[in-house]
């Protein structure tokens, strides 16, 4: 019962907040949402990035509102990316290893799905496989996060406008022999096999799927594959989704490999991924500056590595240097920062459950959709009204 009442109350509260400002004027509705997740990025990682820049402000520090979120999963103090991704994407706790479902197997609606129902263009940009957690939680329902072929099947029928990341093998080198990219192309998708094709794309729907389970770490990319990929891909995604002719857009961008480097206790690799992600955040903030009605939300799914910053061995506190020490090669239960910028950012302050983020985003989508309907003209808001060329397909 509480689960049903809370979203209704939240929408009501946000409707009241959106109805007027101090002057009695209607507040700008949230039209576009850019949700940015640093996988494995906790307060220690954000601190390390600031320290490495000589305490010069990071792009994330441009945020006008900040908060803290708790990451524990259903039945566990330390979450994995599947449970954390489900909380951030859908607004409910679940067990580790579970994607887009409650512990008892009930499918959950994600923020991305809610945005589709509101008539928005939708997209995902990541540096890992698109079928990995947490991005998969925005589209799929899967009791086993490692059943990535099944997740790919759900992506293929999801109606998402833009899908960018690694993991092509789960679409085209499958145990069932199906070529999902061909099936997607038959429904109107363009396919971009590499970065150059992605950046040259002009329309959606688009699937840019790269080989392997992830792109190279930015700091270890001797082949020049990575470069400024995340920044350029974020820019391209915003360009395509904002020009898609929908009632705004929802874009999820993940700096996926902060987590991988931290699992390996690779300080240089971790810092390289943090810098890359921070540059992408700056791109999103810049777009919000130019386009009122845009909310940019930045957070992590959990902290990885149990990172601490301490004086070098034998030195006193107050030294100009610091030593990075990882206490584990796994996740920790550390609280995670939340940075909010743009329209609606004021709703993401204080200490919150990770589930509150998705619930508030859904409520803001609902409020914006109602205001658009009330003050312009009725808009198609069901999944069946998505463009026919890439409508959702049933999956076996």
Tell where the protein language model's regions lie, with residue ranges.
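Bacterial N-terminal signal peptides that target proteins for export
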Residues: 1-9
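Bacterial N-terminal signal peptides
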Residues: 8-17
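N-terminal catalytic scaffold of extracellular/periplasmic and nuclease hydrolases
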Residues: 21-174, 180-198, 204, 303-386, ...
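Structural motif
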Residues: 35, 163, 208-210, 250-254, ...
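Metal-dependent active-site segment of extracytoplasmic phospho-/sulfohydrolases and closely related
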Residues: 43, 275-316
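Active-site His/acidic residue clusters
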Residues: 133-139, 212-222, 237-238, 245-248, ...
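A Trp-anchored, charged/polar loop motif used as the substrate-binding/catalytic surface
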Residues: 190-194, 225-243
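Short, intrinsically disordered C-terminal tails of secreted or membrane-associated proteins
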Residues: 391-393
